[in-house]
Amino acid sequence: MNAPGPQRMVRPRGVHLPVTGPWPGDHGRLRSGGHGSRVFTTHESSEPLLRGTDPEQVHRIERPNARAADRPLIYAHRGSSAAFPELTRSAYVQAILDGADGVECDVQLTRDGHLVLHHDAQLGRTSNGTGPVSQHTLEQLRALDFISWKAVPIPESHGRRHEQLLTLDELLDLLESVGRTLGLAVETKHPSAFGQGLEEAVLVLLMRRGWDPDTGWLGNIKVSVMSFHPDGVRYFLQSVSPRHVCQLVADTTVSTVRHSMRVGPAAAVVYRAGMKLVVPPAVPIITNGEVELAGPGIQYVRDHPRDVLAWRSNGSVLRVWTVDSFADTHVCLSLGVQQITTNVPAQVLGWVADASAGVPTRHEAQFA
C-alpha cells in the first residue's frame, strides 16, 4: 500500500544548471545567478539556532571545513549519537558543533503521512511508546519521550525536550540554517507498511523544497538517498542521478546486526532474517554500476576488501558505516574510502587529521 501524498514535482530533463566550487566527488555547488540557482544564506529567524552557545561554538558552526577535499568526508550517523539520543535535535546540533561534514538519518512514515526520523519500525527501544511508527500520527509521536533512555542531560542550546523528535522537514530547516556546506544522507527503512510510498514521500518532500536530483544540491545541503532494499534504491533511480543514490550492503550475521543496529539478540535474529532476503541482490546493484555510491558496513569492508577495492576502481564512491574506532578508521584510510559514517564524528575527524599530518597517536596499539 502506497502512502497518500501530493503529486511529485517533475523536473524537466536535460536542464543543466551552472555549478562552481569544490565538493569532493562532484562538480561543485550551485551559486547565485541564472535560472534555478540558489543563494546560500544563514539562519534569518530571530530565534538563535543554538540557544546558549558561546561565540567560539558559533564560529565553529559557521566555518566551512576547508580541507575536506584532502580527506574523507565524515558523516554523523544518526547525528552525534554516541553523545546524545540518536536521530534527535540534540544529536544533530552536536554533530554540527563537532564539525561533521554531513549527517545521516533514517526515515519512517507516520499514519498521517509525515516523514519522521526514527530507525526502528517499532517504537520502544528509544522511546516510551509501543507499536509501529506507521500506526501513529505525528501528534501522537510528539507526546512521547525520545530522550530519557539515553540518560544524558540535554543542554538548552541543543533544543527543548518537546523539540527532540524531528521530521525530515525540520532536519532540513536545521541544516539550512547553518552557515556552511553540509551533506545529508537519507535512508529509507524497510520493510515499510507503505512500500515504495516511503521513497515517493522522500522525493516529494525534497523536490517541494527545491532539491535538484541531478546535482544533489538543496541550497547549502548536498543530499543523497539510500537504502538496503534494492527495490527502494531502484525506485530512487527512476528520478535521481546515480551519483546521489547509495546501495547499502552488509554481511548478515547476528553479531554484525547487533553491533551495527545496536539491538538485542532477539531483535538481531529478526533483523537478520529480513536482511538476508535483501542483501544478496543488493551487491550486483553496485558491481553493475547502477549506483555510484556504495555503502558497505565496516565488517563487510574487513571481510571483502578485494570487492570494495574493485568497486572503488570502477568509480564508486565508498560510504562506509559505522566507523567508531581508530582501527576501523585506519582501515578506511588504507582503502581510500571517500566517506566515513560514525557515531563519534569529532573523534574520527581527529584521527583522520592526525593520520594526514603523520602525527603518532596512542591509539595505534589497537592495531595489534
Question: Which residues does each PLM region occupy?
Answer:
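Phosphate-group recognition and catalysis centered on beta-loop-alpha active-site segments
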Residues: N2-A368
